[in-house]
Amino acid sequence: MAANRPAIFAVPAAAALLLWPALLNGYPIVFADTGTYLSQAIHLYAGWDRPVFYSLFMLPLHATVTLWPVVVAQALMTAWLLWLACRVLAPGSSGWVFVAGVAVLSVCTWLPWIVCELMPDMFTPLLVLVLCLLTFVPERLTGRERVLLVGLATFMIASQQSSVPLACVLAPVLAATGAAIGGPDRPHRHQDKRRAAKVCATGVAFHSPSWPGLA
């Protein structure tokens, strides 16, 4: 519990820093496809060209009232994943250092813009981060964190069609790289490969209902 105390402050603070484009705009940023993602869950239909899972993710958050909770949730998800990466890769870093790093990212990169956009595009870079954590440092994660990351990776793959080829190529490459770096005695090397295969297979399976529409 003590190890999680910095996150109670750091994650919400970092999430707030990532929301400045929406605050500057006066509203979450919309794109041409945003309407499709919103309408699928509201009107109960599944378009062949847009997976429904991002629509289902948004519906309980906006509840057809306001879209602000969606971008707040996206900012919190992003901040938590960045905090998790910081904690396992640089365990000596303080919460203040983490928030300062996110402040730099929020000013110098495009990250806050995709976080504030009502599109699943933010899941592409986050998927890379999640797969790297699961592959290279699974032993530094708690069992609950590994389960959450596997669930998030599956959701991210299922939410965007472009994530399918990305994950199918990246996951086995990362698993092989992790095994090669760690050598034959690296713990979890076999679990890495199985986990990558299961995540990819599940995410791809969720896409299968839309394949007939591609013909």
Task: Label each PLM-derived region with a short phrase.
Residues 4-29, 106-107, 204-214:
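Transmembrane signal-anchor helices characteristic of membrane glycosylation enzymes that use polyprenol
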Residues 12-20, 96-110, 115-117, 125, ...:
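Transmembrane and membrane-interface helices of multi-pass
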Residues 24-37, 45-57, 61-65:
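Extracytoplasmic catalytic/substrate-binding loops of multi-pass membrane glycan-assembly enzymes
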Residues 52, 59, 63-67, 71, ...:
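Aromatic- and kink-enriched transmembrane "portal" helix at the membrane-lumen/periplasm boundary
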Residues 68-92, 103, 107, 126, ...:
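Transmembrane-helix motifs of polytopic, lipid-linked glycan transferases
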Residues 84, 123-140, 145-153, 170-177:
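Specific aromatic-rich, kink-prone transmembrane helix
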Residues 146-161, 201-209:
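Membrane-interface alpha helices of multi-pass inner-membrane proteins
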Residues 165, 184-187, 194, 198-215:
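Juxtamembrane membrane-water interface segments immediately following transmembrane helices
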